[in-house]
């Protein structure tokens, strides 16, 4: 297994002059990179991948070199150590891998067009130009770009253009930065521009296939977010401009290239007249996430990839801090509780999960660090925990000092904890060590013992079994009975329960606000007290009660059947924080029934009972008077009514479809996906299938594309399913960036599942060649494991993935997902009778 060499140890670049000549028609790249730096020995290496090195010149004289493709390097022999100017000439192909320099395709007026963009994180700058491609190897960069330019085309880069001469566009030198943040793009683009109060130019760029007003929302959010961050961080934005660019083909969600942030179109552009609130919230949080990186990740960067969480966890928290300040009426912290928190709690409960801080020993493992549920979601939750501990005043002061101390340089987690600790007077590093370096999280049991004492105990929580290694965490308890701020040991006695209950006058609860990364299991006495006063709980506390209960049931620490009465209790709550988790639990009940069985029929009736009052209250037509919660709750209850085969819902959705049959984009976007799903489920035909796939191909509206992607995989006609699966490998129909969503949709449909499962097994080599370098490649395995829950599928999963378990970057995912499916199989076997009996009692 290849080990990672640190080329920075022997060669420290200071400045790059990067010349690149891109010919789109010939699909070629010719380049020349001049690196000024210091060699600490005569034998040095710089990174390259897929580059053909033509010549290496050191201080004006050709020198010996050897290309080492296994190490993604070019080995160079210098006359002596010390200051050196390296000039490296090379050429390579322009490929469609979505990494390095690559073309991005779209249609305009029926003709296929392309723009060129870049994606260099994690280690893909080396596919564009020779460099020391390590985060610590910060340098300045002067870009000179030539391309087969057509009149009216736009070229963008990290810094403003200085001048153009001989068809070459020369850009101002960058500030000191890491290679993975270098970016440029060119093509036929439209834009909208503004300027912040402090003078930073802000722009949004997209292809001309989009309507101009689709750029407006992003421009407003970006401008206000930069102004917010400059104030919150008390540190100026360090560059002259901040460009936001939507690329038609993009592997990640977005990328924080300094001064030129790139996005999937779905995460930047939206129709201001017909976009649901949840999509606006999503786009806003993606933009503010990337802009948070301009300081945290770009200005100050982790030394090595094992501290990736420093970048991503912090940006993940700050996206909510900023959007909450920009649009407080959205209550966006509820979105955090609905997305990041459950993602972290579920993933982090599987034995074998990575810790937030994890060592990297193999180049192929770097991309596997981007575990969204851990590095992003759990890490953000850790920082939310810290914020709650120290408060915003200390947080802002600590960050100001942190940026001042490390700007244009690198840092570690210890540097951040020190800055926050100095500002708050709290030893943040000591508290956070257990959360950063240990995988998993604790369940805290709260019980009244025989002596009447209220006792807390902590132990690691597992779903699907796990090896208890006696881990403990320093837990911010956030109790409502004056509990200690931090629980350090395995056991804590809080005193006489009766006296505490009388003194406090309310049920005992821990983790109030749900900011700390643990769950609580109350004994029967304490839980009964909470449920008797459930109407006094705020939405987050109700959500927390439901969420913790499901996790405990999934771990078989309580019966899954005990969740059924809780669903009935909270079914008519009007908060999306509650309803979203309620239907998450309700949908999980489907694993306990066989399709079209009497048990499933009873489950459908149960869904009808849960959703009936809410459907009547909200119906299928969004109204101007809808509250934010109404807008967000509606899709959950309408989807439930469709599963219930509710005749009124089916008819109303069908009517909306027919009323807009000539232009499906005019269906209210808040319900459009469900309207289309209803057609596929209940009025399916080849004509409908062809109509929707044609619309998918022709539209540039990302929201409409997602609605079609949600609906079409519900098709059951075998010939239509075959046709759809065949298009998985046709990039003109389904772009590789969107393939996972289509695969998941077909796999989740029991009647078409076999087609998708056969496809991924038969076409694994194609999938690996197409998206194998993508940081989300392993999530195709995750998606599969999230769907499977039967012994037969577990056996097939093991048979296919066991031989791949030693593949770098896939090992952890395969091992964890085997445990995940095994746990579900065991749960269903043990609980299905009790669950189905409990459902039957409610119908």
Question: Model regions: which residues?
Answer:
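Short, well-ordered beta-strand segments enriched in hydrophobic/aromatic residues
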Residues: 29-37, 453-458
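Surface-exposed beta-strand/loop patches in extracellular or lumenal glycoproteins
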Residues: 34-51, 133, 142-148, 461-476
């Amino acid at each position: 297994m290849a080990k990672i060499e640190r080329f920075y140890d022997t060669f420290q670049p200071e400045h790059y002059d990067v010349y690149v000549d891109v010919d789109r028609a010939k699909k070629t790249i010719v380049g020349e990179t001049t690196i000024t730096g210091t060699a600490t020995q005569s034998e040095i290496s710089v990174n390259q991948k897929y580059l053909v090195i033509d010549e290496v010149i050191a201080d004006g004289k050709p020198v010996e070199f050897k290309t080492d493709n296994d190490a993604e390097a070019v080995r160079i022999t210098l006359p002596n150590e010390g200051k050196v100017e390296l000039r490296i000439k090379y050429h390579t192909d322009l490929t469609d891998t979505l990494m390095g320099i690559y073309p991005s395709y779209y249609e305009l007026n029926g003709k296929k067009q392309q723009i060129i963009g870049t994606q260099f994180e994690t280690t893909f700058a080396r596919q564009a130009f020779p460099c020391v491609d390590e985060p610590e190897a910060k340098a300045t960069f002067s870009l000179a770009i030539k391309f087969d330019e057509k009149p009216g085309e736009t070229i963008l880069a990290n810094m403003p253009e200085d001048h153009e001469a001989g068809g070459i566009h020369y850009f101002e030198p960058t500030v000191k930065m890491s290679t993975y943040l270098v970016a440029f793009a060119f093509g036929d683009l439209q834009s909208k521009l503004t300027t912040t109060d402090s003078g930073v130019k802000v722009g949004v760029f997209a292809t001309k296939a989009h309507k101009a007003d689709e750029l407006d929302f992003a421009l407003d959010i970006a401008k206000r977010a930069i102004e917010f961050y400059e104030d919150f961080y008390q540190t100026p934005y360090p560059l002259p401009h901040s460009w936001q660019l939507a690329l038609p083909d993009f592997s990640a969600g977005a990328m924080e290239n300094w001064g030129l942030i790139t996005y999937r179109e779905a995460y930047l552009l939206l129709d201001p007249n017909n976009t649901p609130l949840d999509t606006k919230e999503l786009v806003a949080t993606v933009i503010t996430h990337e802009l948070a990186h301009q300081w945290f990740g770009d200005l100050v960067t982790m030394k090595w990839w094992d501290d990736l969480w420093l970048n991503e966890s912090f940006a993940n928290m700050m996206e909510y801090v900023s959007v909450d300040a920009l649009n407080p009426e959205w209550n966006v912290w509820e979105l955090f509780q609905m997305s990041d928190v459950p993602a972290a709690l579920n993933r982090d409960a599987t034995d074998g999960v990575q810790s937030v801080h994890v060592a990297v020993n193999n180049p192929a493992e770097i991309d596997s660090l981007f575990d969204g549920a851990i590095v992003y979601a759990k890490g953000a939750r850790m920082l939310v925990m810290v914020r709650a501990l120290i408060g915003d005043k200390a947080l802002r002061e600590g960050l100001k000092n942190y940026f001042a101390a490390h700007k244009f340089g690198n840092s570690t987690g210890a540097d951040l904890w020190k800055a926050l600790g100095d500002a708050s007077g709290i030893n943040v590093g000591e508290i956070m060590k257990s959360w950063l370096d240990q995988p998993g999280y604790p369940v805290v049991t709260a019980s009244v013992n025989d002596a009447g004492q209220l006792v807390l105990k902590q132990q690691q929580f597992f779903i699907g079994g796990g090896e208890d290694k006696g881990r403990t965490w320093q837990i911010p308890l956030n109790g409502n009975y004056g509990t200690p701020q931090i629980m350090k040991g395995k056991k804590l006695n809080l005193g006489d329960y009766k006296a505490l209950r009388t003194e406090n006058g309310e049920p005992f609860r821990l983790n109030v606000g749900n900011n700390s990364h643990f769950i609580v299991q109350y004994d029967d006495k304490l839980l009964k007290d909470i449920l008797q006063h459930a109407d006094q709980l705020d939405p987050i506390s109700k959500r927390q009660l439901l969420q913790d209960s499901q996790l405990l049931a999934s771990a078989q620490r309580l019966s899954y059947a005990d969740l059924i009465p809780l669903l009935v209790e909270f079914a008519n709550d009007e908060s999306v924080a509650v309803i979203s988790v309620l239907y998450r639990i309700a949908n999980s009940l489907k694993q306990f029934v066989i399709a079209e069985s009497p048990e499933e029929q009873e489950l459908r009736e149960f869904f009808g009972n849960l959703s009936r009052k809410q459907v009547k209250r909200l119906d299928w037509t969004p109204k101007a008077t809808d509250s934010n919660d109404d807008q967000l709750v509606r899709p959950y209850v309408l989807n439930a009514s469709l599963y219930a085969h509710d005749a009124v819902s089916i008819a109303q959705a069908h009517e909306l479809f027919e009323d807009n049959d000539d232009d499906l984009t005019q269906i209210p976007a808040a319900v459009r996906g469900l309207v289309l799903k209803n057609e596929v489920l209940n009025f399916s035909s080849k004509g409908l299938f062809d109509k929707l796939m044609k619309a998918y191909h022709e539209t540039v509206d990302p929201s409409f594309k997602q609605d079609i992607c949600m609906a079409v995989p519900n098709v059951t006609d075998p010939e239509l399913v075959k046709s759809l699966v065949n298009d998985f490998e046709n990039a003109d129909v389904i772009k590789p960036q969107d393939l996972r969503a289509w695969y998941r949709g077909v796999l989740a449909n029991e009647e078409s599942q076999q087609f998708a499962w056969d496809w991924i097994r038969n076409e694994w080599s194609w999938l690996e060649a197409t998206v194998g370098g993508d940081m989300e490649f392993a999530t195709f395995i995750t998606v599969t494991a999230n769907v499977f829950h039967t012994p037969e599928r577990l056996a097939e999963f093991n048979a296919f993935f066991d031989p791949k378990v030693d593949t770098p970057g896939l090992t952890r995912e395969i091992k964890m997902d085997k445990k995940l499916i095994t746990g579900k199989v065991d749960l269903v076997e043990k609980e299905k009778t009790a669950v189905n009996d409990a459902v039957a009692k409610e119908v």
